[in-house]
Amino acid sequence: PDALTPRLKLHKVVSSEKDKLEILYNLLCTLGYHSTLVFCNYRDSVERVTGYLQAKKFPCDMFHGGMEQPDRERALYKFRNGSCSVLISTDLAARGLDIPGIENVVHYHPPVNEEAYTHRNGRTARWEASGNAYLILHEEEFVPEYISDDIETYEFPEVLPKPAKPRWATLYIGKGKKDKLNKIDIVGFLYKKGGMAREDVGQVDVKEHYAFVAVRRSKMKQLLTLIRGEKIKGI
């Protein structure tokens, strides 16, 4: 689908400050616990935005080409499995990544051209889903010419909600396919040794040398206590 799909609603978010960090924080708090991809034009901006949000105790992660591959994989996995509902990224995430269910796209920086705009917006409102795109502009910035300038201005609620806490957390296991470990082994271990019920375990992703498991956040502390020192399949 292109950037103009009727299922995609575009909003303009006006910032009175040239530095848009505070208005981004306010927007993300208002959007709540919904899968949101925030696009910046530069790697250092991604790191700066992520650092600002995390310092304000806002749960988010980052994704850009300067990161090590395992760190990029971990960030994407947490975003996919619901451990982290907000991902701050360069245009690296605008194409080719399979991340279903993204509800919001935020343009922290205006896209460099129409193609980038189309690819960014193409992350949401996919197939039969609907989605929202938010363009953050300083009050003196113009809407890029390839975007209709009669877009609706986003109105913030009078009372700003607190940051939403993710329902899931990610458990990292330092063994994977090379160790003959599979999903059934991991889930069985979590049920038997970790006291987890079926609804406490979410997405399981087994890589060559390690695995990620989504666990209900409220049960993570109890799980770590129960499995400390235990082995999966004797490894």
Residue ranges of model-derived segments:
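Non-catalytic terminal extensions of ATP-dependent helicases
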Residues: 156-235
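Ser/Thr-Pro-rich, acidic low-complexity intrinsically disordered regions of eukaryotic RNA-binding
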Residues: 21-26, 47-51, 118, 179-188, ...
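RNA-recognition motif
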Residues: 1-5, 64-66, 200-209
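A short beta-strand element within the Helicase C-terminal
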Residues: 86, 95-110, 132-136
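Conserved catalytic network of the ASCE P-loop NTPase/AAA+ motor domain
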Residues: 1-7, 28-32, 52-56, 68, ...
